[in-house]
Amino acid sequence: MKKAKAHHDMAQDEELVFLPLGGVGEIGMNLGLYGYGRPGHRQWIMVDCGVTFPGPELPGVDLVLPDIAFLAEQRRNLKAIIITHAHEDHYGALNDLWPGLNVPVYASPFTAGMLEAKRAFEKSRSEIPITIFKQGDRINVGPFSVEAVGVNHSIPEPMALVIRTQLGTVVHTGDWKIDLEPSLGPLTDESRFRQIGEEGVLALVCDSTNALREGVSPSERQVSESLAKIIADAEGRVGITTFSSNVGRIRSVAEAAEAAGREVLLLGSSMKRVVDVARDVGLMEGVKPFLAEDEFGYIPRDKVVVILTGSQGEPRAALAKIARDEMRNVAFSAGDTIVFSSRTIPGNEKAINDIKNGLIEQGIHIITDSEALVHVSGHPRRTELQQMYQWVKPQILVPVHGEAAHLTAHAELGLQSGIPSVPRLRNGEMLRLAPGPAEVIDEAPHGRIYKDGTLIGDFEEMGIGERRKLSFAGHVSVSVVLDSRYDFLGDPDVVPIGLPEFDDEGEAMEDTLYDAVLGAVESIPRAKRKDLAMLQEAVRRAVRSTTNQVWGKKPVVTVFITKV
């Protein structure tokens, strides 16, 4: 009887928790952990493993990844990683972080293909074994039973997850929308969500991206019709730039081009990789082969459509090269049309406007989503969110995938819609979903790490603070050689990098700094110059002070003093 009571007490201690390490309080870098068991003995599954992209405040950084230090002690208790879809903010960190985790990965055929294509392109040494997991499948992982439910989004084969445990069922939506006329893939599975709702849902962990927008998102089919009309009516070449992962839109454009008697050229390596994967899994059946780039010049202007990367102003993408007239085999002319079939991601406005201006200077006609319905979001607006609430009838709503404004608006909508519990949650906070009321019970290490080239590290390890200083005020290198009497042996060597060439009186900056170095050393008696560290610091301070006087900024200064 004692053993039975002990087992009962242990069972009573078991908890179901949700711990986001990214994507809650920000857009991007989505990574969520579900844990089950007693504190200190929980087993975990990871849902998604995404990146976000650096802004100008992170000079030189290529990608921003979630810090998974929390999992260092939980590595043996992490049972699986499940990827909901192949957008960078949901799967982009997996190739870099998986070697430190080495656990089974579950993903759809398209997502698995994208992971392999990404690994090959990045020349990653880690070959991730992936188990195919698609709409309608169920897997048992430790204390979790996970079902994939089909949803609609702006990429092939997205899925929501139904995570069942002894303490209740969680619906994790991933990215989704309700589109009754999608251009590719099935509808969001209303029937299955309703069935799951009838079974009883403890918590809905739900996309908040468009929680500030009223109504229902327009259909992708409407975008297809709008693009088809633009292509049919255009007199010259047509270029359409969109997100490279939007296979449905690429396919729609290709079909519209064929209907208008036009050939299609794909430009951009990322888009070509996506289309190759889509072909491999059967998503491009019936679409004619695309032109080779060197065939472009032989096609009449009114017989070609170019689908190209660069909708976010990426300087090395195909569209930016077109705007700068730098492409070898492809160019647009006055009277041609380029359509921005995309939204502007915050932070990219200037880069996109620069490209638009470059195109307009060439006489190219620009069409954006402010002039025509050429883009729709892949995320649910408020009416769609309320529809999901009605389908699954959750006891708890956990808004995720959004910044503070999105999460707050989503929470208010949930409460207005009658959901009993809507806890506030941010990255690193451990939310107990059951037993008892939903509440934050702990905080885990969380944050960001940075990928630069082939290296990954934290803010200090990657020298980002120093880079910021360098980008703001440049660098001065000073080399001083002293003889046995601690006098100058030759002239000091002063090399300013990234500083103005002249001060406001026309004096060369290098000469001004040279004088500062001489003055700093000569102001110190010979006997005290033996303290090379003190002398080094005196020179550094003198150079920074002088540049501050003549320029108003203090550069990074590196001083080398050698005594021979």
From Swiss-Prot:
GO CC terms in record: cytoplasm
EC number(s) stated in the UniProt entry for this protein: 3.1.-.-
Gene Ontology molecular function: 5'-3' RNA exonuclease activity; RNA binding; RNA endonuclease activity; zinc ion binding
UniProt-annotated binding residues for Zn(2+) 2: 89-90, 175, 401
UniProt keyword terms in alphabetical order: Cytoplasm, Endonuclease, Exonuclease, Hydrolase, Metal-binding, Nuclease, RNA-binding, rRNA processing, Zinc
Organism domain of life: Bacteria
Database matches in InterPro entries: Metallo-B-lactamas, RibonucZ/Hydroxyglut_hydro, RMMBL, RNase_J_2, RNase_J_b_CASP, RNase_J_bac, RNase_J_C
Cofactor: Zn(2+)
Protein's cellular compartments: Cytoplasm
Binding annotation for Zn(2+) 1: 85, 87, 153, 175
Keyword rRNA processing applies: yes
Phenotype upon gene inactivation: Not essential. Loss of 5'-processing of pre-5.8S rRNA, and the 2.6 kb rRNA which form the two 23S rRNA fragments. No removal of last 3 nucleotides at the 5' end during processing of 16S rRNA.
Binding-site positions, substrate: 375-379
Major location (coarse): cytoplasm
Top EC class, one word: hydrolase
CC cofactor note: Binds up to 2 Zn(2+) ions per subunit. It is not clear if Zn(2+) or Mg(2+) is physiologically important.
BP terms from Gene Ontology: rRNA processing
Job description of the protein: An RNase that has 5'-3' exonuclease and possibly endonuclease activity. Plays a role in 16S and 23S rRNA processing. Might have a role in mRNA maturation and/or decay.
Similarity field: Belongs to the metallo-beta-lactamase superfamily. RNA-metabolizing metallo-beta-lactamase-like family. Bacterial RNase J subfamily.
Subunit composition and interactions: Homodimer, may be a subunit of the RNA degradosome.
PANTHER family: RIBONUCLEASE J (PTHR43694:SF1)
Protein name listed in UniProt: Ribonuclease J
